[in-house]
């Protein structure tokens, strides 16, 4: 199943408290459970003003629907084509 990188513009994201991040995570997880196993949240990276999320989903529309239901921004959704790391250089 394809993986997607979602860029979410959230001003002040890096200053969200642990409790706020927990609440956002709980809401996201509840929606994912309701949507079924075809869409999965892998992880997220929080920066100053953006959150970058990795999802496994059948298509970008499923990612958009998750964002719509949660009221989360999804400013850019890109399908991940491949992953490289330092071992790729060997």
Language-model features and meaning:
Residues 1-33, 40, 50, 85-90:
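Short S/T/G/P-rich N-terminal loop/turn motif that feeds into the first structured element of a domain
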Residues 20, 47, 55-58:
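Generic, well-ordered alpha-helical segments
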Residues 11, 53, 67:
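Short, flexible active-site loop motifs that bind/organize anionic cofactors or intermediates
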Residues 41-52, 63:
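Amphipathic, hydrophobic secondary-structure cores in small proteins
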Residues 37-43, 76:
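A short linear hydrophobic-aromatic micro-motif
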Residues 56-83:
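An amphipathic, aromatic/His-enriched active-site/gating alpha helix that lines ligand/cofactor pockets
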Residues 9, 44, 56:
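Acidic/polar N-terminal loop/beta-strand segments that form early-domain functional surfaces
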């Amino acid at each position: 199943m394809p993986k997607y990188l979602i860029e979410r513009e959230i001003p002040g994201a890096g200053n969200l408290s642990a409790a706020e991040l927990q609440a956002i995570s709980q809401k996201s997880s509840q929606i994912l459970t309701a949507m079924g196993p075809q869409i999965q949240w892998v992880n997220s990276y929080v920066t100053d003003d953006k959150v970058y999320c990795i999802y496994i989903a059948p298509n970008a529309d499923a990612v958009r629907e998750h964002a719509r239901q949660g009221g989360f921004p999804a400013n850019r959704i890109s399908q991940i084509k491949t992953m490289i790391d330092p071992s790729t250089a060997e």
